[in-house]
Structure formats: C-alpha cells, structure tokens
Amino acid sequence: MEKRGLAVCISNAAVFLQYGETKILIDGLYKDLGRNFSELPEKVWESMRRGEGELSNLDYLLFTHSHYDHFYVPYLQEYLEHNEVKGLCLPPGERWRGKGHSLSFDEEGKIPLPEGITLRFLDVRHLDKQFYDVVNRCFWVEIGKKHLLFLGDGDYQEEAFEKIRGLPVDTVFVTPIFYNNAKGRKILREILGVKKIVVYHLPFPEEDTLHYERMTRRDIEKYGEKDENVVLWNRTGQSILF
C-alpha cells in the first residue's frame, strides 16, 4: 500500500508533518510572549509535555529562528524530558546544552531522513529591518512525491532565494506579510514557480486583533492569479493530504 503524507496546522507557524511512521514538527514549541498571535492550544501542550497523543515522541523538531513565537526553550526542555526525539534542528546561532541530538547537514545544507524524506535548509534574514540581524532558516522537505517549503519569518530577499531556483516546490508556507509584499509574490512566482500557497503564522480568527486574515483575503482578491491556489491556515487541524 502506498504511503500517504499529511501536513497539519497546529497554531501560529507550528506545522506537523507525517509520512509513514516518521513525524516532524516545525516551530511547534513556542510561546506568544508578544501577544500578537495565538498560543499553542493548552490541551495540545498538556498532551505533548506528558508524552501523550499524536504529538508525543516526535522524530524531528525543527525551528526556523530564535524568536519566542517560534522557539521557546522551556517548552523544548520539558518536551525532551518526557519524549524521545531522534533529531533537532535548532535556530541558527542557538547554543544548546540540553538533551537531544542535533542534525548534521552536508555542505549543501541537506540531510536524508528515514522513509526517503530529504530535508534541506536555506538561511535568509528575518522580516523587518529591526530584525535583520536574526537569521531565519527556511526548510525544504521532500516527502513522498511532494516538495514543501516553509519560509518561517523569512524576508523577501531575491538574491537569497536565487540559491534554490530550480528546486521543485509544490507547496510553500508563507507569512501574510510575505504574501502582502510585491517582492514576496515575485519570489513565489518567478523564482520558486509555486502554484499552491499556504498563508500561515496567523492568529486564530477570534484573536486576530491586527486583522491579518482580512488583509490576506484582500490581497488574494487583489493580487491573486488564476492558476494559483492560495489558502489560509488559522485554525488547528487544517490539513493537506498527499
């Protein structure tokens, strides 16, 4: 029987991937200290910290960068105390002395994982001039026959994304700010050539005080192209099967 893949929205920029028996979580141990987005749902975190449920004993934990709304050290420490994890990809520059094994990438920034999965990274600067000194690690995942690209809070630097021109990308995960910017949309269309776009890193609708959802829907209506499929992820459980 052919293996099926699954990508699931947890909250904010947290995405769970599963292919066969291999489980990966991206930016899933975080805390919204700035109160601009939504917290990791309490029931989800309680299960994780006890080593129970679908998000227990994840094989790989990946983090795009060191901001609290993507990576929260106390949560990682507690998770590792109660769960078995095969590998970590910590934020660039993070000095970690806790439990866990860091993944070793080759010179091309690539590493093979079980079940034919390939993980690759691209480092770009963080969005917003005040955060340009923060390195954001984008993750490209070849999983089954699909190629997923997670941009985290990556900035719209054409010269950075030129490094992965030609890599197949079936679905890209971007912030509403990236999609809102003309340079961001140019990267998606002309460099990455991607037709399925998931706008994530959004608060839950009832907590969206800055109206990110309204802005994004307006942008889709105004700037979207006929051959593009753009969807919003702002509820736990939204998913893609492949």
Where are these regions (language model features)?
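Active-site neighborhood of phospho(di)ester-bond hydrolases with catalytic His/Asp-centered motifs
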Residues: 25-27, 57-69, 88-92, 149-154, ...
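Active-site beta-strand termini and strand-to-loop segments that position acidic
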Residues: 17-20, 113, 141-144
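Active-site HxH/HxHxD metal-binding segment of metal-dependent hydrolases
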Residues: 48-111
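Active-site-proximal loop/helix segments of hydrolase catalytic cores
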Residues: 127-191
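Active-site environment of divalent metal-dependent phosphoester hydrolases
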Residues: 13, 32-33, 66-71, 94-98, ...
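Pre-active-site segment of Zn-dependent metallo-hydrolases
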Residues: 22-62, 74-78, 129, 155-167
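Binuclear metal-ion centers of metallo-dependent hydrolases, dominated by the metallo-beta-lactamase
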Residues: 99-117, 163, 186-242
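Zn-dependent metallo-beta-lactamase
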Residues: 1-25, 29-34, 38-42, 218, ...
